[in-house]
Amino acid sequence: KSIFERDRRDWLVIPDAIAAYIYETVNKMSPRVGQFLADAAQTPVVVGTRTFLIRETSKLTLLAEQLMEKIKNLWYTKVLGY
């Protein structure tokens, strides 16, 4: 598949996957520190920041998708003459 056809929202799961990997690794070495990380991830500041970032990146993703559609439309109409 080309980059235009792939699901462009896949990259939004990368930060969560990284956080889960870090948590699992730390938890294997020290369950106490792992529990501290789990508790810290649930604090209002972290949850609020994560929610804000997800909301804003979703907006940017939608804008990027709209831009790509406009570029594809221009390509087909102006360059290829369809």
Curated annotation (Swiss-Prot):
GO molecular function, one term: enzyme inhibitor activity
Domain of life: Eukaryota
GO biological process, one term: lipid metabolic process
Record key words, sorted: Storage protein, VLDL
InterPro entries on file: Apo-VLDL-II
Tissues/organs with expression: Found in egg yolk and in plasma.
GO CC terms: chylomicron; very-low-density lipoprotein particle
Functional summary from the UniProt entry: Protein component of the very low density lipoprotein (VLDL) of egg-laying females. Potent lipoprotein lipase inhibitor, preventing the loss of triglycerides from VLDL on their way from the liver to the growing oocytes.
Family: Belongs to the apovitellenin family.
Assembly: Monomer.
Protein name: Apovitellenin-1
Organism encoding this protein: Anas platyrhynchos
